[in-house]
UniProtKB/Swiss-Prot annotation:
Envelope glycoproteins are synthesized as an inactive precursor that is processed by host furin or a furin-like protease to yield a functional hetero-oligomeric complex. It comes from the Viruses. InterPro entries: Foamy_env (IPR005070). It holds the Pfam family Foamy_virus_ENV. Residues 1-65, 976-982 are cytoplasmic. Glycans are attached at residues 109, 141, 183, 309, 346, 390, 404, 412, 484, 522, 551, 776, 802, 827. A motif (Endoplasmic reticulum retention signal) lies at residues 978-980. This is Envelope glycoprotein gp130. Residues 1-15 are annotated as: Involved in virion budding.
């Protein structure tokens, strides 16, 4: 293709073209003349005018086919931009008209509208009898829901939290104390020990150990008291003035019943029976009682050598059976604990008991303020105590020959002068228990030397096992011989191991004191505190008391450089488990309220760890047999473990009376407090262990919620909403109520907004606000109204607990209205909306709703469906008290964004047609036709093209402007820059 002509060439071409046109119209010139004229004109110099330059510019713009095509493309682009801009401008004008039109009105003042629909139920009657067919009808009862909100009973009480009390409890469990209370034998002690170890080891395997930022409980006075009391409450050390053993090898105490020849025994087991010398008829040749038992008579009681040791200078015992009448067994353990603690603090100097605490037999200045004197029957049940501690020897003998008493002397007694009458009164009257039968000897038959016949000096008394006991009780007249002999001087010094533990713990620490005193109790190899309380009496030879306390360093659970990290880790453990404990200062601030005088007594308790002995919390098990007592303890222990694993509180082991008294709470509030309290085990430790005894400690943290107000009759809000068909879109309208629960006490209704709530049996909230319900008046709340696009068809059916159904649907079936939420109750099974509706357990004729809500009339924006469709999520479109003007402004902010269109072009045109239908019907029909053509007729080709252009409209406008500027510069570049000179 030839390049475009320059200005001189174009002027020459133009002049030659004009010359040819002029010569064609002149016929007077010949061809040669015409050629001559053309040559002359070509040789003439042409000077362009302004008009020539303008014409040349037009020529230069369209000189080639490429330039022509560019101009055509530019014109097409400009036409498209103008078309789209004009169309959007017209649409915007239409949007403004649609926005200013009032939208639909929802009047939620209709309640309890009942509609009955009778449907013929298909029924096939099969019967052998002739029956007339009958038609049954299904009744559907419907009631509309005001404001699209359903209220259902809220069964859980709602508790407004006033404060939280944090309590740490250390629960001590000592099997030996429990065994002593229940009078268990050594065999059953092993079973009790195994049971406690099994339960607490299982609890320990499921709990992690960590520390509370409340201090070590071992430094606490209450802990020290309970620990010392649990281990050494009834332990004492008695010091003789000088070592004095028992004066004889045998002892005659006929007031004690004897074991029967055949079991079972009539009387319960007597400890002195362990020392009984039973007369056996078979003995080896040459056997004599003197060679084995010394001066002790066969048929009496033999005192073993360990009770007759000449070097015994002290007596160590752990028993509560020597206390006076002040220690009443009918009192509970806690009452006796307080009494003993008071007595010891008043009757001791450091750890030594004052003289007035002892009986006269122990000290000449004694007044029996703490211990009592021995009675004659004590030797039967507490033989070691009598033999080691008694200062005198009382012989109660019914043996023939003692004190020169004979049969003739008995018959001369005043009460025995009529023997025939006395025998009718009692068979034991006026006779000896043991008669003298001759010298002791063993007779053998033939060569038999091992199994010979033994003849005792006195008769065998087992057949009359209760002779002496009945004689002591004066059950019959007869001889009573009592002999009193001095054994020791009554100048005892008595020391309390409990007071020694309490006083030394302040100086040496509880761990060191416990170790030393427990070692002291094990002086003979058998721990005295693990013996039976009736026999826990041992003699010692010059023991060192007080013992030497070792320097025991407390176990450090964390390094110093990791102290802060470890502490924060423990607190995080609490936080992760749902507890609000965040430090000692915060805990005490939650617990302590100095301005509340009713709490001041409780504050001192809560600042320290609460220490509890398990045996003090149990029922009275002294009347139970061994296995029954173990089962009782097992039941309590298993229940405690189960409750702790459930993070609840076993109120058997911690009393709540102080909360009720100090906080002035009612019994109903106390029930809430007990139910909502939480527990957390923070350590389980076995402190001691042996074959027959074990002791454990359980550290438990409690959080006790103190209620400020309790809301009982509550209704829960179910916001189902209301359906609206707007601008071709199905929209779900909801009112955002400011409350979640309605409380109705008597006839007074309260609308409650709950914050920071946890569900733990009851609903416990930090904040409960009383708000106003939604309404159109100024006395009610202005609630936001939201719209959400939903798909057609919309069917929501929810079964209610009363047997009815909550229905919200966009279509009608079984005469159930569309768009309006309804409560539906049927009397027979019927299928609606593809769902089977079943009748309730009983027939309901009317569905009542409580409480009632105020009147609410709501106007929605005209294009609420368009707004919800644009946002594609639930948005606020108005409020219950918003003015029409504000509503229109809100709608404009949402709808005018369509000026810069986003989306499929045919769909947008159809949406515009739907929005215009009720405002400008003719335009709506035209737009609908265009949308149908673009989406259907042209199979989307043209529509897609236009849609792409619509998406790129801002880009195309920018490109068009850039092209115009570029073409202008290009056109300017085509113009000649310099004039040609001839």
């Amino acid at each position: 293709m030839a390049p475009p002509m320059n200005l001189q060439q174009w002027l020459l071409w133009k002049k030659m073209n004009e010359t040819h046109l002029a010569l064609e119209n002149i016929s007077s010139l010949t061809e040669e003349q015409k050629q001559q004229v053309i040559i002359e004109i070509q040789q003439e110099e042409v000077i362009p005018t302004r008009m020539d330059r303008v014409k040349y510019l037009a020529y230069a713009c369209c000189a080639t086919s490429t330039r022509v095509m560019c101009w055509l493309f530019l014109i097409c682009v400009l036409l498209i931009i103008v078309f789209v801009s004009c169309f959007v401008t017209v649409a915007r004008i239409q949007w403004n008209r649609d926005i200013n039109v009032f939208g639909p009105v929802i009047d939620w003042n209709v309640t309890h509208q009942a509609t009955y629909q009778q449907l013929k139920a298909a029924r096939l009657t099969r019967s052998l009898k002739v029956e007339h067919p009958h038609i049954s009808y299904i009744s559907i009862n419907m009631s509309s829901i005001p404001q699209g909100v359903m209220y259902t009973p809220h069964p859980e009480p709602i508790i407004l939290k006033e404060r939280v009390l944090g309590i740490s409890q250390v629960l001590m469990i000592n099997s030996e104390n429990i065994a002593n209370v229940a009078n268990l034998s050594q065999e059953t002690k092993v079973l009790l020990t195994d049971m406690i170890n099994e339960e607490l080891q299982d609890l320990s395997n499921q709990m992690i150990d960590f520390e509370l930022p409340l201090g070590d409980p071992r430094d606490q006075d209450q802990y020290i008291h309970h620990k010392c009391y649990q281990e050494f409450a009834h332990c004492y050390l008695v010091k003789y003035k000088k070592p004095s053993p028992w004066i004889s090898e045998g002892i005659i105490v006929d007031q004690c019943p004897l074991p029967r020849i055949h079991d079972p025994n009539y009387y319960k087991y007597q400890p002195i029976w362990d020392y009984y010398l039973k007369i056996q008829n078979i003995r080896p040749q040459g056997w004599t009682s003197k060679s084995y038992y010394g001066t002790a008579r066969m048929g009496s009681f033999y005192i073993p050598t360990f009770l007759r040791n000449n070097t015994v200078s002290h007596v160590l015992f752990c028993s509560d059976q020597l206390y006076g009448k002040w220690y009443n067994i009918e009192n509970n353990i806690q009452e006796n604990e307080q009494l003993l603690k008071t007595k010891l603090y008043n009757l001791t100097t450091y750890s030594k008991l004052k003289a007035r605490a002892l009986p006269k037999e122990w000290n000449n200045q004694g007044n029996a303020r703490l211990f009592r004197s021995f009675n004659p029957l004590d030797v039967c049940n507490r033989p070691e105590a009598v033999l080691l501690l008694n200062t005198t020897y009382f012989t109660y003998s019914l043996w023939e020959g003692d004190c020169n008493y004979t049969t003739a002397l008995i018959q001369n007694l005043t009460e025995c002068r009529q023997p025939d009458r006395l025998k009718l009164k009692h068979p034991y009257a006026c006779r000896f228990w043991r008669y003298k039968e001759g010298q002791e000897e063993v007779k053998c038959l033939g060569n038999e030397k091992k199994k010979c016949l033994y003849y005792s000096e006195y008769s065998s008394p087992e057949a009359q096992f209760d002779f002496g006991f009945l004689s002591y009780l004066n059950a019959f007249p007869g001889l009573k011989y009592i002999e009193n002999q001095t054994v020791r001087e009554p100048e005892y010094e008595v020391y309390s191991l409990y007071m020694e533990c309490m006083n030394s713990a302040e100086k040496y620490g509880i761990d060191s004191v416990l170790f030393a005193l427990k070692t002291f109790l094990n002086f003979t190899g058998t721990p005295v505190n693990e013996m039976s309380t009736a026999r826990a009496f041992v003699g010692l030879t010059d023991p060192k008391f007080p013992p030497t306390y070792p320097n025991i360093t407390k176990e450090q659970k964390r390094c110093n450089n990791l102290k802060r990290r470890k502490r924060s880790t423990n607190i995080e453990k609490l936080r992760s488990m749902g507890y609000s404990l965040t430090g000692a200062v915060q805990t005490l601030s939650q617990i302590s309220d100095i301005n509340d005088e009713r709490l001041q007594q409780g504050v001192s308790l809560l600042r320290d760890h609460v220490v509890t002995l398990m045996e003090a919390a149990l029922h009275d098990i002294t009347i139970m047999e061994g296995m029954l007592a173990i089962q009782h303890v097992h039941t309590h222990l298993n229940h405690l473990k189960t409750i702790l694993l459930m993070r609840k509180i076993d109120w058997t082991f911690i009393k709540s009376n102080w909360i009720k008294e100090q906080l002035q709470k009612t019994e109903d509030e106390m029930k809430i407090i007990r139910r909502t309290a939480k527990s957390l085990v923070y350590y389980v430790t076995q402190t001691s262990s042996s074959t027959t005894a074990t002791s454990w400690e359980i550290g438990i943290y409690y959080e006790i919620t103190i209620p400020k107000h309790i809301y009982l009759n509550n209704w829960q809000v179910i916001n189902i909403g209301h359906l609206v068909e707007s601008a071709g879109h199905l929209t779900l309208i909801r009112v955002k109520h400011p409350y979640e629960v309605i409380n109705k006490e008597c006839t007074y209704e309260q609308y409650l907004h709950l914050e920071d709530c946890i569900s733990q049996d009851y609903v416990i909230c930090d904040t409960v606000q009383i708000v106003s319900p939604c309404g159109n008046s100024t006395t009610t709340s202005d609630c936001p109204v939201t719209a959400e696009k939903v798909k057609e068809p919309y069917v929501q059916v929810s079964a209610l607990k009363n047997g009815s159904y909550l229905v919200l649907t966009s279509r009608t079936d079984c005469s159930i209205p569309a768009y309006v939420p309804s409560i539906v109750t049927v009397n027979e099974t019927v299928k609606c909306f593809g769902v089977e509706f079943h009748k309730p357990l009983y027939s309901e004729s009317k569905v009542s709703f409580e409480p009632q809500v105020p009147h609410l009339k709501l106007r929605l924006p005209h294009l609420v469906g368009i707004i919800a469709n644009l946002q594609n999520l639930e948005i606020e479109v108005t409020s219950t008290q918003e003015s029409i003007k504000d509503q229109i402004e809100r709608a404009k902010s949402q709808l005018l964004r369509l000026d810069i269109h986003e989306g499929d072009f045919p769909a947008w045109i159809q949406q515009l047609a739907s929005a215009t239908r009720d405002v400008w019907p003719a335009a709506a029909r035209a737009l609908q036709g265009i949308g149908n053509v673009l989406s259907n007729t042209a199979q989307g080709i043209f529509g897609t093209t236009v849609s792409i252009l619509s998406y790129a409209k801002p880009i195309l406008i920018g490109i068009g402007v850039i092209l115009l500027i570029a073409f202008l510069f290009k056109i300017v570049s085509w113009l000649p820059g310099k004039k040609k000179r001839n």
